[in-house]
Amino acid sequence: MPRKPSPVRFPNRLTLGIDEAGRGPAIGPMVMAAVAIDSRTAAILTRKGLRDSKAYGAGEDAHALRCDLAAEIRARAVFVATIEIEHTEIDARVCRGELNVLEREKATTLIEQAPTVDKIIADGKRMFAALGARFENFMSCDRAEDEHASVAAASVVAKALRDTRFEQIKRRYEDDCGPIAGGGYSNAATQRWLRTYVEKYKRLPEEARRTWPYPYVEDLIGDQRPPKIQTELFG
């Protein structure tokens, strides 16, 4: 009786995903994360609900969900690393028009820390395209967290850590000026809180990025941003 052919076995490929959280807020750090997972782990995490970190929404429940999933990712991934970029470093690089350069540098550091992988994927096609000349298995694309589980995992890890850091900042000021609503982004809720703080202290809080525009408090403190700012905040 002829033997049955062996089933085809596909390689369990290892992919490193890179993403950030906190590029846009006016308050607090930015966090970059890299996560290396194999295809089996990617499937497991996807079944457990892994998605782009923004898909979970805002608020305490969403933060708790992201933290739980980040813990699951850390337990299952081959490699997880994060870099926290403080507001002072962000300001220094924005003044030189180098925010994108800063992110590429941090991404390079994460890649060099990681084990050898089959593919590296970063979220942000234009932002990270230059790294393709340095790493032959590198690709960058927009909305990568929607298509690649490794990038979604990096997004969740980065966002969970960024939100944890922001919660620590909130607790510093809550008794004095009330909770910072709006996640520290330049939205109406954050603007109201900053207005309350500046009315009381006549200056921006320590964790505020000085290179971000604050027209809603300039009547109280003038423009406290550094001179000769080159705008590259969201490009």
Predicted regions and their residues:
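RNase H-like, Mg2+-dependent phosphodiesterase core
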Residues: 1-235
